[in-house]
């Protein structure tokens, strides 16, 4: 995250009381005087020699400390950390506690800017242990623990700091972020995240940007050893970043990255880019380096011609040579440039601003307090005219820079949301880019012990709600080719044809009311209604359609009568209500309601009883809105014994399929099987006798 390090040069500067030339002159003068003393005072005691040696060491140590301060002021954090570490190790633990505390704090500041949160935490702990007086060390320790994901320890440290500084907004938001992270631990996420190994090296690789009609190109910055030149950065200890790119082949596979062609890359840092809508102009961040001045960054442009990029041209945001300007992001319509700056007029740290690319006069706009904080708000990505993604360490988050999504509700008013894990982590997460769908790439230094940034891919897995089912006939045999239609109150309409086994599957929306209708040639339609849950989790539903045959009688299960009576019992209501639904779903059907008895009793008695029972069913249907013209009651007594179907055979394996349960056959059975056969013969069923009712 080199450019974030550069753009933070002017925040929390460390003390530097002596210019470099003065420090070096003093050191040289002191060394000369020491030689004179040694030549003219050979007879003095060893005590004086030792005293002078100690003084010499102290003077050189002070010189090193001044060098480290100058390195830090120039943003050379890596070099400064090496120098501070040498000074720290030369200081005695007991006799020089204040000095060790001060140097430990400055060393921690280097590690903080190098994203080495573990080392930073250790350094700040040492500063506090050696009684460094500035409570800022406690705040920075809390932030380092926060970035390590040590939320419980970070909470305690934030609370200690807030006891001394109760109104510090960064500490308050940090404390809130830690508590929220603890509460959300283990909450499932719909995002999948994987390291983009093809784009990553053993150094830092960051800020990917997808481009192309099919998002088949990706540009990113890298400090790989393949970057231009041999110079190592004093800021990071790595090579300065160059811009690389990769393309997909005909199979849709990413190819090995290469440096962009042309004059764009130099020995200085280049990276964090965005493109004009036509793709011919690149806006990118470039380091500015002047002798004896802090490294800063500016926005440059380059144009493409024949796949090569032109020499960079500085894009002058405003006439300001003291502020930093970087992280450009062009709006999809090409009208605006979003960028990051520490210029005056912000809310502290780095702020996100916007300027018109069409009419620049009077169009400079700070995005306001919904986006910008007292911390650093960086890496804007404009996905649409009203949706902005950015990273911030000032809003409550999981640690370091966290990714946020913001929807515009006014010029400077936004509704923002913190993106969930695993998009965010306790480390720095930034530089997100999207393809057309909810997938893309971003940058994170999670799990890297050196704090190096790497590119990760992500994909949002939508909530999957399905309904599966089967269509059978009354004998539980599948009805292949049955047509199932489903209509939702969200306007969705779907149609499926049942497979050979009668099964089907639909994908549903969340919290939608549906009506389903199943039908097939030779069968009556059946309709069912249900509502899917508005759940954030995957869900599966199951439904069964049992289609009555038009050509064969359909038994109505669970119709009960009292012994020797025709009155319907209460247990029969559910089955009869299902029949009412079938008749309402098939309004042109006329049916015969038939009742059958077992072999017991005379034919005349059974004929009368069965007819009265059939009429009881018809009367119930009429009472519940079915026209009498669509119903016919018929009693058959014991004259039509049941023929064993596949379903009956599955329930009663002792009866072979196709067997007629006649009185003669039943009498040949055991007593137990006779009772089972009599139960099968006692039934109420209906048959379709017309399809022309109007």
Where are these regions (language model features)?
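Short, conserved micro-motifs composed of acidic
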Residues: 74, 78, 113, 117, ...
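Short, acidic Ser/Thr/Gly-rich low-complexity loop/linker segments typical of extracellular
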Residues: 489-503
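Short, ordered, surface-exposed loop/turn motifs in non-cytosolic proteins
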Residues: 80, 349, 475-489
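Periplasmic OmpA-like peptidoglycan-binding domain that tethers envelope proteins to the cell wall
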Residues: 392, 397-399, 596-694
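A short, solvent-exposed beta-strand micro-motif common in secreted/extracellular proteins
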Residues: 512-522
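Short, solvent-exposed beta-strand/turn patches at coil↔beta or beta↔helix junctions
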Residues: 549-589, 597-604, 669-691
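A short, amphipathic beta-strand motif
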Residues: 68, 465-474, 502, 545
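Structured interaction patches on ligand/partner-binding surfaces of diverse proteins
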Residues: 521-546
């Amino acid at each position: 995250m080199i450019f974030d390090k550069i753009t933070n040069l002017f925040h929390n500067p460390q003390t530097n009381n002596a210019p470099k030339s003065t420090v070096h002159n003093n050191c040289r003068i002191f060394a000369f005087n020491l030689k004179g003393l040694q030549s003219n005072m050979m007879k003095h005691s060893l005590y004086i020699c030792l005293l002078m040696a100690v003084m010499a060491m102290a003077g050189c140590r002070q010189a090193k400390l001044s060098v480290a301060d100058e390195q830090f002021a120039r943003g050379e954090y890596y070099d400064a950390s090496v120098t501070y570490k040498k000074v720290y190790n030369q200081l005695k633990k007991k006799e020089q506690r204040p000095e060790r505390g001060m140097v430990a704090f400055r060393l921690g500041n280097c590690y903080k800017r190098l994203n080495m949160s573990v080392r930073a935490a250790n350094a700040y702990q040492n500063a506090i242990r050696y009684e460094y007086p500035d409570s800022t060390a406690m705040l920075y320790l809390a932030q380092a623990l926060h970035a390590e994901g040590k939320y419980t320890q970070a909470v305690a440290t934030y609370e200690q700091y807030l006891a001394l500084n109760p109104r510090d907004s960064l500490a308050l938001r940090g404390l809130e972020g830690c508590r929220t992270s603890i509460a959300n631990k283990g909450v499932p996420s719909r995002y999948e995240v994987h390291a983009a190994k093809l784009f990553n090296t053993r150094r830092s690789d960051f800020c990917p940007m997808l481009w192309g009609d099919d998002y088949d190109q990706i540009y990113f910055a890298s400090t790989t050893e393949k970057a231009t030149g041999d110079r190592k950065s004093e800021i990071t200890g790595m090579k300065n970043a160059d811009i690389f790119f990769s393309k997909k082949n005909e199979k849709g596979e990413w190819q090995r990255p290469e440096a962009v062609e042309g004059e764009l890359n130099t020995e200085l840092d280049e990276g964090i880019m965005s493109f004009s809508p036509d793709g011919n102009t690149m806006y990118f961040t470039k380091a500015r380096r002047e002798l004896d001045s802090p490294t800063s960054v500016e926005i440059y442009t380059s144009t493409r011609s024949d796949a090569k990029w032109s020499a960079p041209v500085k894009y002058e945001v405003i006439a300001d040579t003291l502020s930093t300007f970087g992280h450009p992001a062009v709006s999809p319509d090409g009208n605006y440039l979003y960028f990051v700056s520490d210029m005056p007029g912000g809310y502290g740290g780095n702020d996100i601003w916007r300027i018109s690319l069409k009419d620049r006069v009077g169009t400079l706009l700070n995005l306001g307090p919904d986006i910008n904080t007292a911390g650093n708000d960086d890496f804007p990505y404009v996905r649409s005219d009203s949706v902005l993604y950015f990273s911030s360490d000032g809003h409550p988050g999981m640690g370091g820079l966290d990714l946020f999504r913001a929807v515009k509700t006014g010029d400077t008013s936004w509704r923002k949301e913190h993106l969930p894990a695993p998009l965010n982590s306790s480390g720095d997460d930034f530089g997100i880019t999207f393809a057309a769908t909810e997938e893309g790439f971003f940058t994170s230094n999670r799990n890297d012990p050196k704090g190096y940034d790497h590119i990760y891919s992500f994909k949002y897995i939508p909530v999957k709600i399905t309904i599966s089912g089967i269509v059978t006939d009354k004998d539980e045999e599948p009805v292949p080719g049955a047509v199932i239609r489903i209509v939702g109150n969200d306007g969705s309409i779907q149609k499926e044809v049942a497979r050979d086994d009668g099964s089907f599957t639909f994908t549903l929306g969340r919290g939608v009311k549906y009506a389903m209708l199943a039908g097939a040639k030779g069968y009556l339609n059946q309709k069912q209604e249900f509502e899917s849950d508005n759940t954030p989790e995957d869900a599966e539903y199951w439904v069964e359609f049992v289609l009555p045959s038009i050509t064969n009688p359909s038994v109505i299960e669970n119709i009960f009568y009292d012994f020797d009576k025709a009155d319907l019992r209460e247990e029969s209501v559910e089955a009869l209500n299902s029949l009412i639904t079938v008749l309402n779903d098939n309004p042109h059907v006329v049916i015969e309601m038939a009742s059958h008895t077992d072999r017991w009793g005379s034919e005349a008695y059974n004929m009368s009883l069965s007819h009265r029972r059939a009429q009881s069913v018809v009367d119930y249907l009429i009472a519940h809105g079915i026209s009498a013209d669509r119903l016919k009651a018929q009693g058959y007594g014991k004259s039509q014994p049941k023929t064993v179907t596949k379903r009956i055979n599955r329930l009663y394996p002792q009866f072979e399929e196709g067997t007629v349960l006649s009185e003669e056959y039943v009498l040949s059975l055991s007593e137990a099987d006779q009772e089972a056969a009599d139960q099968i013969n006692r039934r109420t069923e209906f048959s379709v006798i017309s399809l022309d009712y109007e």
